[in-house]
């Protein structure tokens, strides 16, 4: 069985800890000019992503679920690389890892929270197959995809994100949201590109990110240069939606 309610409960705790250490780090730096609490903040920042691996996974029992959470605790990307010889920074990291282990030990099956939206990290063989399929279809790898340079995707439409913002809700409706799920494929601090299965399309955040449907029949790509590109079967409806912005196309 899956423990999605517990996973949501755990996720909310990780978010709370991340924000707590973010605030404390700023305050300590303001007070003393120095703080290593960023180590704790980045630990929980990474955990908020990694717990998404647990969504919809089946476990034999709750003990197996807890064991899977513990396996996520070691940092994949060390935020203390600049301080490898700084024992204080490493001590902060070990202390934070233990804080997380202790919390997982205290988790119970009754620790449950409702999910505000669906978000699952795609990993393993499923991720490998999906990465290959997206590369074959759209020549996209969660890295800068320049829409003017020759590529096999055919016709595209691109414009600056600012001209799309007034149409955001209607664009989401064109994608089938909220009644369907999309793949969100973008750059990440924690992986060589992260793929999430989501039922919400987040507003532009300034990073490389693409949204695709389950059949990969279209792509919406946001670049770090404030542009958005559309290609595939969604192109016709998007042209109708953005007809008033034609002077800003391409």
Regions found by a protein language model. Name each.
Residues 1-250:
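Structured alpha/beta or helical-core interaction and ligand-binding surfaces enriched in interleaved
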């Amino acid at each position: 069985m899956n423990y999605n309610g517990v996973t949501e409960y755990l996720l909310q705790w990780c978010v709370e800890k991340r924000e707590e250490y973010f605030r404390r780090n700023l305050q300590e730096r303001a007070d003393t000019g120095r703080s290593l609490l960023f180590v704790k903040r980045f630990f929980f920042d990474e955990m908020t992503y990694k717990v998404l691996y647990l969504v919809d996974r089946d476990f034999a029992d709750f003990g197996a679920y807890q064991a899977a959470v513990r396996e996520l605790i070691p940092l994949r990307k060390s935020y203390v690389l600049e301080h490898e010889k700084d024992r204080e920074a490493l001590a902060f990291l070990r202390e934070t890892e233990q804080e997380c282990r202790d919390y997982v030990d205290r988790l119970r099956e009754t620790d449950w929270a409702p999910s505000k939206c669906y978000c699952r990290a795609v990993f393993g063989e499923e991720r490998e197959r999906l990465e290959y399929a997206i590369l074959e279809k759209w020549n996209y790898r969660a890295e800068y995809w320049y829409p003017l340079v020759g590529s096999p995707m055919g016709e595209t439409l691109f414009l600056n994100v600012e001209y799309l913002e007034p149409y955001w809700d209607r664009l989401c409706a064109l994608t089938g949201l909220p009644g369907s799920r999309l793949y969100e494929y973008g750059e990440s601090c924690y992986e060589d590109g992260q793929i999430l299965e989501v039922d919400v399309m987040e507003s532009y955040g300034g990073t490389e990110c693409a949204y695709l449907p389950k059949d990969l029949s279209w792509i919406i790509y946001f670049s770090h240069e404030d542009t958005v590109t559309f290609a595939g079967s969604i192109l016709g409806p998007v042209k109708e939606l953005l007809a008033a912005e034609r002077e800003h196309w391409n």
